[in-house]
């Protein structure tokens, strides 16, 4: 596993089977291999945790999945990305076979979650 700090609360985790990008809104991103899926998380709607720039990543990485906190308005998601976007609520579990994500109530806004990818669990 490789963890790369991007900016503010944003970082990238690379595992054997996927990339996980957290709360990206600005900063230099490394190159992504198209062989692995890219999961993009936004923990809540504040502009230093969610920006529409994440949807530009689809052009360079077609195997992309967006997991957004329930408090982010769905109208902020471009039409071209709607099928690749899931909204996570506290108590909800999303599982696509590669990544399992469970939502928890946050102490602030948005959602905290636990990700399980091949026995690696991270809480954010």
Residue ranges of model-derived segments:
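Core dinuclear metal-dependent hydrolase active-site scaffold
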Residues: 1-35, 86-124
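Active-site metal-binding motif and surrounding structural segment of the metallo-beta-lactamase
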Residues: 26-72
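A generic "binding-loop/recognition-motif" signal
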Residues: 9, 46, 72-73, 90
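Short secondary-structure boundary micro-motifs
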Residues: 3-4, 49, 70, 76-78, ...
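Short hydrophobic/aromatic-enriched beta-strand-loop microsegments
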Residues: 65-68, 83-90
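Short, structurally constrained coil/turn elements
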Residues: 60, 79-81, 95
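A generic "cationic amphipathic patch" detector
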Residues: 16, 53-55, 79, 114
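Short, aromatic/basic amphipathic alpha-helical patches
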Residues: 75-85
């Amino acid at each position: 596993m490789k963890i790369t700090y991007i900016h503010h609360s944003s970082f990238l985790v690379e595992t054997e089977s996927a990339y996980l990008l957290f709360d990206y809104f600005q900063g230099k991103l490394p190159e992504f291999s198209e062989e692995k899926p890219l999961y993009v998380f936004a923990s809540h709607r504040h502009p230093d945790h969610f920006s529409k720039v994440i949807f530009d990543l689809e052009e360079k990485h077609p195997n992309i999945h967006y997991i957004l906190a329930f408090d982010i308005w769905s109208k902020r998601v471009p039409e071209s990305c709607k099928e690749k976007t899931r909204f996570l609520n506290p108590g909800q579990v999303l599982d696509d076979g590669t990544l399992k994500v469970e939502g928890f109530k946050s102490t602030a806004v948005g959602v905290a979650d636990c990700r399980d990818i091949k026995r690696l669990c991270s809480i954010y």
